[in-house]
């Protein structure tokens, strides 16, 4: 495959995904890219610095994610038999997988937008939707609260695919010190792919995502493509 052509495909997917993110911030794509490119934060209030941190992290992560995703799709197509229909793989990645991924990008970004505008002393409580679709492991975390300043990254939704949990302000004292064996709750509930959070400047999709496990021969071309795209937006 031609690397320049492949890079264009990757960048188109990354920008589409980033578009899902920036609309949650109430800005358009061009404005978001200007914010990412501008490294001078000296004139920004704290909430705007957090906002920029989230946008930079999102674009950085989504470029890597799109590079890995398109590479995985190419690998799957390579493994096909001649009689197999490539449209099946296109549909799988560009419709089935992408729909779930875009939904999680939207949700992680919505949480981040809300987060950056909260004072550090706010107490935040983890909540579920309270219906039959809630996973038992997520229900076990309901009501757990921390100050924003020390809120664990792993507890910021989404913490798994299609997670609908959310955070609310609590006006009682944080209760995390009252909870026994928090480590086991984490292990049961949190998908490692989501152990970091955009709200704290982490990636949307973590390094544990299977897309990032690729054939060794693709690693260097992937790094080159990702770096080329990021350099356009002053991400180093």
Which role does the model predict for each range below?
Residues 1-160, 168-236:
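Domain-core detector
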């Amino acid at each position: 495959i031609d690397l320049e052509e492949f890079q264009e495909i990757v960048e188109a997917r990354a920008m589409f995904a980033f578009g899902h993110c920036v609309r949650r911030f109430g800005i358009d794509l061009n404005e978001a890219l200007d914010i990412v490119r501008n490294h001078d934060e000296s004139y920004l209030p704290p909430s705007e610095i957090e906002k920029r941190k989230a946008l930079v992290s999102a674009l950085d992560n989504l470029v890597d994610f799109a590079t890995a995703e398109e590479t995985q799709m190419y690998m799957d197509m390579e493994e096909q038999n001649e009689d197999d229909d490539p449209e099946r793989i296109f549909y799988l990645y560009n419709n089935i997988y992408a729909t779930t991924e875009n939904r999680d990008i939207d949700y992680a970004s919505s949480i981040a937008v809300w987060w950056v505008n909260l004072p550090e002393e706010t107490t935040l409580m983890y909540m579920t939707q309270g219906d039959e679709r809630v996973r038992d492991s997520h229900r076990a975390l309901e009501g757990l609260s921390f100050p924003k300043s020390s809120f664990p990254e792993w507890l910021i939704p989404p913490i798994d695919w299609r997670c609908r949990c959310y955070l609310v302000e609590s006006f009682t004292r944080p209760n995390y010190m009252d909870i026994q064996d928090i480590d086991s709750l984490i292990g049961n509930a949190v998908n490692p792919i989501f152990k970091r959070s955009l709200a704290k400047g982490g990636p949307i999709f973590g390094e544990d995502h299977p897309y990032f496990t690729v054939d060794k021969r693709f690693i260097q071309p992937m790094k080159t493509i990702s770096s080329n795209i990021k350099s356009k937006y002053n991400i180093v």
